[in-house]
């Protein structure tokens, strides 16, 4: 069997091109086709003159074939202003161009309350099944929100629930536009910050100590109890016990190194292991083990590296660097430093956020900001808003880009199976009978669409069309109305730019 597979793989180059010709004879005349790199699509219809006064959706449906996305994606709807923006993005930038199988989950606060938050768990489980989720910003209720919506309980953060189920790392990265000034002007390249999304302060147990007494920490283990003296209180105070686990730290290391390698950027881990010698030291040791075992050779081949640094040293380096690296942070450090980076690069509204599993297979993408409540209050009253939708648009593009990668892996297996079937049909008796019904397209074209949508956003801003938050960065807090667009006008401007880009040759 092994020899059969080896022989089939050796002949895969010839057989793949033969299969393409079998499926589509017109491909024979095309020189130098790329093997396993997408398929060729029908020629787009192009008009020599523009069609005026036509809706973008109508125009694109007539002019451009929709890209078929072969496998499902999970969509998690959200709350308030971002929910309104989410619908505009889908209606104007996504559904007119893509044929999607969407597994929809409403994570709006009222539906979470109605389902006792089960919908959040179900959406995370669906993400594990389908490998890609795209999430709208959601409300994490506090006491005020509980009263506002009449909630049954103060439900946990949906992001926290999803992170714990996916057990991954949150990576945030700025979206750069040449005309948007940066508070840290030396940051010429993005900095991708990875936040370990498990344990530490976010799963800690804390307590108020009401009076004098000894605080001890104990664990019941098979070899006998372990007991540690923590502090001898002389009066009232506070105490905290927190933890992490090797499995999650290792997954954090794997996903961080996978992200750095994908970007071909160096990777830095920051801890305070000089103080927390065992706790933070465990992070340092596991990262080094994973690097030595799996990644060192690959990193060195591409002239990138992994390095551990103390958190205070790393913060100082970050401020004076020009960017272009991945920064792996523990949970609390990542929470704080990601907002610092966002502001340093200009705006939290220009920050992507993806949650990547340890094996790199499952990804959840979202905007790094909240639900923009202040704008939503104006929106409810029918007043004009100018809300930045770029991070939400990039949530879609980053999720779709990952969907393409997953499809491509599946496609490689499909192509190999097809090649084997031609020489050894007895291995896959049903394969040849199903060949004419197989649809293996969408890979490179989906990636091209994602890249063009991102480019459309950036070029729209760089052309001077932007929302108020970005206009303030350029013109100051008293910016006049002529310098910015409202929420829907900006999305329309991006859609117009995207329409033009989709008529041009592929970027990939």
What are these regions (language model features)?
Residues 65-74, 81-86, 90-117, 124-127:
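N-terminal alpha-helical transmembrane segments of multi-pass membrane transport
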